A protein has these predicted regions:
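N-terminal signal peptide c-region/cleavage motif recognized by signal peptidases
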Residues: 4-6
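Charged/polar interaction segments and conserved charged motifs
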Residues: 10, 49-52, 60-62, 118-131, ...
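Gly/Pro-enriched, hydrophobic low-complexity segments
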Residues: 10-11, 15-44, 72, 85, ...
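Solvent-exposed N-terminal domain segments of exported/luminal and surface proteins
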Residues: 13-241, 248
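Extended beta-strand-rich segments in extracellular/periplasmic secretory proteins, especially
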Residues: 170-220, 277-354, 364
Length: 365
């Protein structure tokens, strides 16, 4: 849970020495599990699929020839309830009779990072610490800040400043109403750059983790709008956190946008989610108390190349749920973090539980 006052201590040199031995350079368990359903970490990374064109932006599924190991559906989901998140269990309870199912494929653990990132992560294990009630990291280099986490907030910071490489993304956002009809709510171009990973030898300090720009193209009422967000790499204390600006066509000027955060409804998805729902979670952790539940084997979405790169979004939007054939599920070890709204704080959600895969530290549920 969240420590107050003194800094949360880094781990000992003896503990940090496990990185690259029984733990991967990023702190995951190197070995597979007892029954072989989770393999050992693959330090070679994901194989490049035949036909991939560098710089094309279109990644080809390297596992396209694989078949599901098994399918979880209305007839058997309760046998797997222990390894399903509450969200997927709820989907079976509500939509199992309508054909909701999960195709579970072989697990792949090909998450790798540059050597300098591993070296910085090793230094961070003994050198980085949380201060200011978990709102700030001191002593971290551009790498994973807490490969051997001692608290819930250390786990969440690993997700919040996870590794990224610059990219552009054209995307469409749809929401499906209660009538089962999809409605286009946004067409946009998103550009993300990651300044803190461009200076690997310098402490993060005030260097941003990411700078995000979104140019809205549709619907017509939003065409021409621009959103710019600078997200900190180490410091959410007062005056140091997220900086956001908006350009609104009708006003013809750029203005600060402090409301682009927390539980403000996100117009990019027609207000059906909050700004801090994006990427499962983002932004300052200040409004919640955080509890580390532990690590557990669970079935989570992973390696869904078909969904992201091959299929048209509109073809995958069912009346009640996404096309199950487009989603790939795998068994992974995940960190589980629970959060409860602090007394005196305001948020649409009073409690949130997050699931982060051990290899990438990315929140997946």
């Amino acid at each position: 849970s969240l420590a107050t006052g003194a800094a949360l201590a880094a781990v000992s040199p003896e503990e940090a020495a496990r990185l690259g031995k029984d733990l991967t350079p990023m702190g995951a368990e190197m070995a597979g599990n007892a029954d072989g359903s989770i393999p050992p970490w693959n330090p070679e990374g994901t194989k490049v699929a035949a036909g991939f064109v560098p710089d094309s932006g279109n990644y080809i599924d390297p596992y396209a020839d694989e078949k599901p190991l098994y399918t979880i559906d209305a007839s058997n989901w309760q046998e797997y309830a222990e390894v399903l998140t509450p969200g997927t269990r709820a989907m079976f309870e509500k939509y199992g009779a309508d054909g909701y199912r999960m195709n579970v494929y072989p697990t792949h653990r090909g998450t790798i990072r540059p050597d300098w990132y591993y070296a910085n992560t090793l230094k961070n294990a003994t050198g980085a610490s949380l201060v200011a009630d978990g709102q700030k990291i001191e002593g971290n280099l551009p790498g994973l800040p807490f490969p051997i986490p001692q608290s819930a907030l250390e786990v969440m910071w690993n997700h919040m400043i996870r590794y990224g490489e610059d990219f552009n993304m054209d995307y469409d956002v749809y929401y499906v109403g209660s009538n089962g009809k999809p409605v286009l709510s946004t067409t946009a171009l998103s550009t993300s750059v990651f300044p803190m990973f461009k200076t690997p030898d310098e402490p993060v300090g005030e260097t941003p983790w990411t700078m995000l720009r979104i140019n809205y193209k549709a619907p017509a009422r939003r065409a021409g709008e621009i959103l710019l967000v600078h997200e900190p790499g180490a410091d959410y204390t007062e005056g140091k956190g997220r900086k956001a600006w908006q350009y609104l066509v009708g006003q013809r000027r750029v203005r600060l946008a402090p409301a682009v955060s927390f539980d403000t409804p996100n117009p990019g998805v027609a207000g059906t989610t909050t700004y801090d729902d994006s990427f499962i979670y983002n932004g300052s952790p200040e409004r919640f108390d955080w509890t580390l539940i532990g690590k557990k084997e669970m079935i989570v979405p992973s390696n869904s190349y078909k969904f992201v790169f091959e299929n048209k979004v509109e073809d995958m939007l069912g009346e009640k749920f996404l096309d199950p054939e487009a989603i790939r599920w795998e068994k992974h070890r995940v960190w589980i973090v629970d959060s409860n709204l602090k007394e005196g704080s305001r948020h649409l959600y009073s409690r949130r539980t997050f699931y982060l895969t051990e290899d990438s530290w990315t929140a997946v549920a």
